[in-house]
Design a protein with these regions (language model features):
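Cytosolic, long alpha-helical scaffolding segments
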Residues: 1-168
Length: 168
């Protein structure tokens, strides 16, 4: 515990733990590709294995989320508003939650994808995973954005990445 009262005004940057969380959420979402490939192949043992891996990853993401919330500084001078960080954390959490839910529903119902739709479905899943990967890249750029004081070339880079994410 810092003894200097001025030190306690400034919070430790929460960006690192947020980056760990989105990385785990993306890892869970990326599991949708092998999951859908196994569904198309009707390899239900593999479908179940991938789904269980996704459940484990989502639970790890939830533990990271809880840790971020518990240790998010309540100090006066955070680099960004606490409410914005909590909102971002909530959005990140939905990435893993939705991926896990999709896998659970499809496995539970043993859903099959009609052959004429299989290629389009894989392309759709790939685009969804690409969007998750772009979100991961954006959050990973936050350190540099903070270091530059939200100015200069780094701001333009992050803005273009966010715009690309909006298009996906």
């Amino acid at each position: 515990m810092p003894t200097n009262p001025f030190i306690s005004l400034f919070g430790r940057s929460p960006i690192g733990p947020m980056q760990q969380h989105i990385a785990k959420a993306h890892e869970c979402a990326a599991g949708l590709l092998p999951f859908f490939r196994a569904v198309i192949a009707e390899d239900w043992a593999q479908v179940e294995q991938v789904q269980q891996d996704m459940v484990r990853l989502e639970q790890e993401a939830d533990r990271l989320k809880k840790n971020v919330r518990m240790h998010l500084p309540k100090s006066l001078f955070l680099p960004v508003p606490r409410s914005d960080l909590l909102e971002l954390l909530s959005v990140q959490d939905k990435v893993a939650n939705r991926a896990k839910d999709i896998a659970g529903l499809m496995l539970g119902r043993r859903m099959r994808i009609p052959p004429p739709l299989q290629g389009q479905m894989l392309a759709y899943v790939q685009r969804s995973v690409d969007a998750s990967a772009q979100a991961l890249r954006v959050v990973n750029e936050l350190n540099e954005l903070l270091e530059t004081g939200f100015g200069g070339r780094e701001t333009s880079l992050v803005e273009s990445m966010v715009e690309e994410l909006d298009r996906e």
